[in-house]
A protein has these predicted regions:
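Internal, well-ordered alpha-helical scaffold/interface segments
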Residues: 135, 139, 160, 164-168, ...
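Bacterial N-terminal signal peptides that target proteins for export
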Residues: 1-11
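Short, charged low-complexity linear segments at domain edges
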Residues: 38-55, 148-167
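Hydrophobic, well-structured mid-protein blocks that either form specific transmembrane helices
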Residues: 137-144, 153-154
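Short alpha-helical "patches" and their helix-cap loops
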Residues: 8, 155-156, 268-272
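Electron-transfer interface patches adjacent to heme c in soluble/periplasmic c-type cytochromes
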Residues: 25-48, 58-136, 146-147, 172-272
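C-terminal segment of classical bacterial N-terminal signal peptides
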Residues: 15-24
Length: 272
């Protein structure tokens, strides 16, 4: 009997300790995850994608044997320094607002002579030998804006219209779960498991989130672009697949990129 009472007392004390420490444990775990990510930054595998993307940028490709030196990302043909920090933007030659990936595809098709099907055949790598040229190019181009202030030209009429459409989409509820982007990213203090969910309706949250994509995902062994991030959000909301390079994807990207204006770009980053 005494032995049983001792066991019961020990269990009661353990439960009490868990109850008292639970609030601290969650906070502590989040802090440790942040430290883990910070420690990994010095050896970010995204650099491998950046190196491959740089080689692709300077190498003549496609039927026309042309390099990306002729590709204008908004600051002049071949200029990559700071270009990503001002995307999406309106391109008169394409008569549309484009983000980085859609502009890269446009240059492949119109300047290098690559078919759109081949240019977009592998949009995202799968963690094996199936590698995406777009992800590598995006890694290189975005790395050249590291430390540059975000300045998406949201006052330009075409970009402004796309921004407003993206804002409407951000708050639009639908799908089998009646979710919107704001369901997960419209309030402070939300998380999925141990993952903090930034409040993208606030400037600080939007800046912190957008400026760290593309990112190397440790759990997947792949560099992921912002287009991939949007696709994965749609999947989790049980929405239909987001069409690559569609007006919907450009609109959402424009809205979120515009909300990040004023912050220094800090990617490609590393995430869980």
């Amino acid at each position: 009997m005494i032995a049983r009472l001792r066991i019961a007392a020990a269990i009661a004390l353990s439960v009490t300790a868990v109850a008292i420490g639970g609030a601290f444990a969650q906070s502590s775990t989040v802090d440790e995850i942040a430290k883990y990510r910070e420690a990994l930054q010095d050896g970010n595998p995204a650099e491998l994608w950046e190196a491959r993307g740089e080689e692709m940028w300077t190498t003549p490709r496609g039927p026309k044997r042309v390099s990306f030196a002729t590709c204008d990302l908004g600051l002049g043909p071949g200029v990559v320094k700071g270009a990503y920090a001002a995307l999406p933007r309106y391109f008169a030659d394409a008569k549309s607002v484009m983000d980085l990936e859609t502009r890269l595809v446009w240059c492949m098709v119109n300047q290098q002579g690559i078919s759109e099907g081949d240019a977009t055949k592998i949009k995202f790598g799968d963690g094996s030998a199936r590698r995406s040229d777009l992800e590598a190019l995006a890694a290189y181009v975005t790395s050249q804006s590291r430390g540059v202030e975000m300045k998406v030209p949201v006052s330009e009429p075409h970009v402004r219209d796309m921004y407003r459409l993206g804002e409407q989409m951000f708050f639009y509820r639908g799908g089998t779960h009646d979710f919107s982007c704001a369901t997960c990213h419209g309030e402070d203090g939300k998380r999925i498991r141990l993952q903090d969910l930034p409040n993208l309706t606030k400037t600080e949250g939007a800046q912190k989130a957008y400026t760290t994509w593309p990112a190397y995902r440790v759990s997947q062994g792949e560099l992921r672009t912002f287009q991939w991030r949007l696709n994965d959000c749609f999947r989790q909301q049980r929405f239909p697949d987001l069409v690559f390079g569609s007006e919907a994807s450009i609109a959402l990207t424009t809205y979120l990129a515009g909300r990040a204006n004023g912050a220094p770009y800090n990617g490609p980053a590393i995430k869980r």
